[in-house]
Amino acid sequence: SGLHIDAEDLSLFGQLLLDDGVHEGARLLPEEWIRQHRVRQVNCDSETDPEWGMGYGWQTWMSSHGYPLDGAFGQYVLIVPEVDAVITMTNEASEGPGDKQAILQAVWDHLLPALADGFQPQPEEIVRTVPTVTGEFDSARSVQGIAPDGSYIVVSPHKESRAWAMSWRCPGTSSHPTDETLEIAVGYEEWQTSHCRVGDDAIDIATSGGWQDETFVARLCVISTPHTFTLRMIPEATTTEWDNEPLNPGGLLGLVHPELRR
């Protein structure tokens, strides 16, 4: 909600902290700051999330293993010196009691022992695919509608492949005062990714869809954020349902990030 750092750069920053603020032999962060940053400065209490009851340092929580940089919805950079590791996660967890605790507990119970033992998994063991949307492909069916936030959406089948083209016209926001149209590819029995430019900003979306009886259903994962939502369209109505409502208003335009230039 205001600061965007992609997963790669989050990992690099975590590595800098793991290396005590030194990068390629050069000290970038003061030694005293590093020392104070990762020790408890504030006492905290939490009955439902034990990790968050261990105290707070400088911009970081204390933890039973190392210490985490903690973002909303279960986004973490875990700095774990005991196994010389940085673990970066961009989850989409709810903010309910115990939900984020369960994520960390899974890391402590399963990933840390593997790292400590020097376990080297095979690629097929570490790659998992998010299930696609179930349904049918129909090359003769299109659908259009207006979402609750005023977005105008048109979904049309590709003529040369089993997929859809989605045109999503977003109403303007305070940061993007004019309407913007996103051209989004929708995969059938697969995920297709789209990099959409919005002025000097951008948004990255992975999408899968299918016809379920008379309803076109698509899942849109805004992969540059921890947010996913479901789109359902019939000629009479269009609905969108976020798994977890974003902190920023503005729908998809509220999730754009500065175009990264390396």
Cite the ranges covered by each PLM segment.
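Short Gly/Pro-enriched loop/turn and capping motifs at secondary-structure junctions
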Residues: 66-67, 75, 92-95, 223-226, ...
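Structural helix-adjacent loops and short alpha-helical linkers that scaffold large soluble proteins
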Residues: 21-30
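Peripheral terminal and inter-domain segments
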Residues: 121-262
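Active-site-proximal alpha-helical segments within enzyme catalytic domains
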Residues: 2-22, 75-92
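Structured C-terminal helix/loop/strand segments within mature extracytoplasmic catalytic/sensor domains
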Residues: 72-131
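Aromatic-acidic/polar surface patches that form glycan- and anion
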Residues: 2-6, 69, 96, 100
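Active-site Gly/Thr loop motif
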Residues: 34-89
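Extracytoplasmic/secreted proteins, especially bacterial periplasmic and envelope-associated proteins
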Residues: 8-12, 32, 106
